[in-house]
Amino acid sequence: MASTRRPFGPPRSGFDLRDMFLDSSRMEEIRNLQARSLGQVTPGQSRILKRNQTMDEKYLMPKEEAMAGRGVSLGLRPPTISSKTRASEALRKLAQIETKILNRKQVPMAWSDVESDSTSIEQSLPKRTGAASVSSQYPHRTFQKQVNKTCVSKSDGPSGNGSRFLKKKELPTEARSPGLAVGTGKQALLPTKKESASDEEEEMLLLRSLMESSREKEANRNQELPGSSVSRSNLGKVFLDPTPDQPGVLSLLSVDQSSLKSPRPIQSTRVGLRTHSRQASSAGDTVSITASPPILDDFSKSASSKMGCIKLASSPSRTELESSEEPVSEAAADSLHDFRINILSIDDLVLADGDKSDGDQREEDCVREGISVRSSSPTSPTRLEAQMWPKNCVFQGTATVVGDGEGLTTESDVSEPPGTSSSAAVQSHSMSRALTASPAYSEDFEQFSGPLALEESLDRTLDTLSKFSSSGQTDIVARQPLSRTEWGRGVTRVVKETAVQTLDPAFAYQWSKAGGIAAVGPALGGAYVDPAPIASHIVSADAIEALTAYSPAVLALNDMLKQQLSLTQQFIEASHQLHGSLLQSLDGDSFHYHTLEEAKEYIRCHRPAPLTMEAALQEVREELQVPASEACLGTCPPRNQ
């Protein structure tokens, strides 16, 4: 399955809008080749076989193989059965779907609105297939008629075979894709809710496979033509292959690159494409669901589908052609919904006094150029042109500011996005500038002190506000004469200026202004010297030393040291008194501590005498006599002595 090829450069993705407009002779050759290749289609094989072969040729075919000065024809493999089978199957199934839709309309229905639906479908379908019905001008389209006839004859049988391409369930209106609903604006208004979106998706898939197969056959047929200048790169440019996930991303990228290089020619190309897509959409659906096999029809329909995707991406904004025909008021009103952030420096905001006329001229030019740019969406290519505006292309409004009551006027530029300037924003901005520029608040403290200064400042502020409001409103009305919205209307505001004037700081000690004078003079008065000095013009050195050697700080420090010394003395005296009282309390105590000598002396003095034998016998006798007498008392008879 591998093919030999030599790439001349990196493959390019997407297509260029300028490459779609080929010569009429090339288109005739491509049409003849397509008719010849479609006439040799042999049905009977499965269209799923060898799918990766077409994908390899689709993504690996370099666009730069056919250069400007080279007539090299590369060796390509012959057309396979799978490409022919896919073309035949695509045509046959597309015709089957259309015939099933036509047969479904012929079923008798009870409601009148269903009959009106069927009549509207019958009116819309011949318009869609009108390009395929003109077979007298293009004789190679007879093959399509034959395929349609065979498909009709096959579908006239039992209806069970044809129901496999029609979905049983109908998607609700909200569940359909929004992009398809917007793209088919004219048919969405018609009551064709019976047709499901799945049929249209199947038709789109079949058309895409048909375009892939035709591209492969045209690339294979190129080497058989001896003098053909049509190469595979041109064919890649002609056949637009929208992917199902992102239908308009490639086209938008190419439009952005081309608009960066040359914005003016792309504008003409865009206008031409828009007129072409308008003709295609008037002939039928914008999605271009048709069964005509020639390359010119595929090219036109696919181009219209691409432009339909671009329309979907840029909705609900208008393009340059339509927006240039609208009045200035509608463009300004629509631009209120298109917010932009303009970050300008101080140099952009400052305008010289002599450039006022030039600024007005540039303002009118910017208004003319901004009409076509502001109406486009951020995803459209004109967004890049809007970002490349010159810095001086802004609305420059002059605001008069009166300063110091001398009639000196200055101009301040109010820079805002085009179409979004409101009188309230400009008025509030210039009011703040007028209040900050007025020096009455800062200079009236010492010059004016009283109610007269307040009245003069209020009058000056009111005059400034009146002059500014008159000039600012006239500029805004001249800039936006036909504004349809009430958001930017001028609002009258009364600003009152209030000021607080304070007195001198009330300190306890007032320093004399003549404190720096060393000599005794009349400034010191009679507080320090004799009122009638003997020699007032002669000052002795002792007097100067006495006046300058001591300062109030030194005197205060001396007094503080004296007080600290007296406090220290009092603390020492109190400590002595406490110690003396403690000693007195200890000396007057009656308790006496005994020493060892005193204890021995006491024992010696109080020791008893030693006991002798006689004393011991005497004590024994005394002890024996006493108990015996006590025991015999009253029991024994008295003894006779």
UniProtKB/Swiss-Prot annotation:
* Transmembrane feature ranges: none
Biased segments, Basic and acidic residues type: 355-368
Q: Which domain of life is it from?
A: Eukaryota
| Coiled-coil region | none
Q: Which residue stretches does the UniProt record annotate as biased composition, category Polar residues?
A: 132-162, 222-234, 278-289
A Pfam family found in this protein is DUF4614
Low complexity composition-biased segments:
374-383, 421-430
Q: Which InterPro entries match?
A: C19orf44-like (IPR040120), DUF4614 (IPR027884)
Print the keywords alphabetically. Phosphoprotein
Residues modified as Phosphoserine:
S112, S198
Region Disordered: start-end pairs: 118-243, 261-289, 355-386, 404-430
Protein name stated in the entry: Uncharacterized protein C19orf44 homolog
Protein source organism: Mus musculus
